[in-house]
Amino acid sequence: MDSRTSTEYNNKTQTVFAVAVQSQSAKKAILAALADEEITKILDSVMYHSKSIVDITSENNIPHTTCYRKTKWLLNEGLVIVDKIIITPEGKKFSLYHSVLKSINVKYESNNVIVEAEQNFDIIKKTMARFYSLE
């Protein structure tokens, strides 16, 4: 089920597609993520731009180990992806993370939790471009 909403953005009206999440495990993961203050900070931080753990921790005052642990959980639940892996001139490797969702709407109706999520099409386009550019 799709629900469409029109929004005004930079003087242009655009249609936003929010998809109802059907999977119970995905619903639980989204609700658990929203209930955790540090995870919501991480999601907010990587919603529009890919960032490293170092960037996320410095922007949000989250302890380094906590940020790694919670980002790993988000990866396992499919709420963020590794957008890019960077190797420094010194040979160190680090990942840049990006959220797969742009917005989440949760409502409770008649003993039923309804979770709607808008996919982050920017990251989907970027991933598809990389996939199709492989020869």
Predicted features by range, described:
Residues 1-30, 87-88:
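N-terminal leader segment of winged-helix/HTH proteins
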Residues 18-25, 43, 53-55, 66:
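Hydrophobic, well-ordered secondary-structure scaffolds
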Residues 27-36, 52, 83-108:
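Short, cationic-aromatic polyanion-contact patches
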Residues 29-62:
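N-terminal helix-turn-helix DNA-binding core of bacterial DNA-binding proteins
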Residues 56, 67-74:
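Basic amphipathic alpha-helical segments that dock to polyanions
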Residues 101-135:
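Amphipathic alpha-helical dimerization/coiled-coil segments
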